[in-house]
Amino acid sequence: SQSLVLSSPPARERHGRGDVSRLGEAAHCLLILVEKIKEIEMMKVILASGSPRRRELMEMLGVACEVRPSGAEEIVTSAEPEKVVEELSRLKCLDVAEGTEGDSVVIGADTVVAFEGEILGKPKGIEHARKMMRELQGKVHQVYTGVTIAVKDMDAKRVVTFCDCTDVEFYPMTDGEIEGYLALEREGEAPVWSDKAGGYGIQTAFGTKFVKGIRGDYYNVMG
């Protein structure tokens, strides 16, 4: 079978307004769309998410944005990962867009991990996180990110939604390694695994040590 590529962040390249990490197809399309809108209509860009990783990605794209997390209840009608993230990204985006006055570009996103047909969101507690790590270690799983962009212009609203999927492979992990990871804490904050789909972040020390490789967009896994 075809092996997965190494999981280190992509090399940096020149792109428009400055040094930006090499982008996956979805992120590249997002950058082009947002830049064209800003150039033509000088709209403000609003990120409908409180995720620090998504804010970091926008900064990497060179796009200044206002962070305005959605407060909408997350209700989905599908059990398919790609449809779930598309539904939730659209829900978040439109929730914020409805409360936004003036011309704007609102971006909503949602990420889930899927393993053998089961959707893994953020861990509900340490036992849930432990179960996730034991399931994922030594195997390949999928990370789905859905993105919705709503463009509000002169009382008209245009909305586009898309999804990207990346395969991620973990090295085998011992029980001791899993427990060591679960014990990691951030000073004054929640445990490192608590706010991430699947209980891990590829851009963290965990990703460097335990992610064997990926097939697809690195930044899709980042969120």
Model region roles, listed by residue range:
Residues 2-10:
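Extreme N-terminal basic, low-complexity initiation segments
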Residues 6, 21-22:
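Short linear segments in intrinsically disordered or otherwise low-structure-confidence regions
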Residues 36-37:
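Polybasic, lysine-rich low-complexity intrinsically disordered segments
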Residues 43-46, 80-223:
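Anionic-ligand binding patches
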Residues 43-63:
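N-terminal beta1-alpha1 ligand-phosphate binding loop
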Residues 62-79, 158-165:
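Short glycine-rich, Thr/Ser-proximal phosphate-binding strand/loop in the N-terminal lobe
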